[in-house]
Amino acid sequence: MPIWPFRRSQASVDSELLLTAVTAASRQSALFGEGRVADTLDGRFETMALHGALALIRLRAEPELGPLAQAFTDDFFRLLDSGLREEGVGDTSVPKRMHKLASAFYGRLDAYAAAIGARNNEALAAALGRNVMKDEASAFAPTLSDYALRVAAHQGERPASAMFTPEGWPALQA
């Protein structure tokens, strides 16, 4: 008799792989540095939000991937919660901070999905400039927009499972 008789769902297993790939893609060194994304807690959140949004945009393209999209979203927010706690945010403050992060994430997801769906590089660059760079006129925002559109196109041409590996996330050209 097995010690733990319950199996994890395939969506849960796949979500863990996807979250690992999203985390790795969001930590590319080419994203950070002078004139690029600030290497701060906020900057790291923004790169995670961008890559998490790209993953969800791809998953939402196939309704049968709904369970994976939900498992990924749950795991994504558990990771953010864990990160806040590791940074020393008190237990009583975490729910309020998570509410703000969730609101910020879903606002970004909506803006990025609309711009990517319309293949509107200017709108995406403006949203990325405003959210990620904190400056709509940022010189790096168009580069980040080109990158996000390239990643979205790359993922749209492949099965969703390709996102579970580093090859599913083309690197930002430095």
Segment roles from a protein language model:
Residues 1-174:
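Surface/interface-facing alpha-helical segments and adjacent flexible terminal/loop regions used
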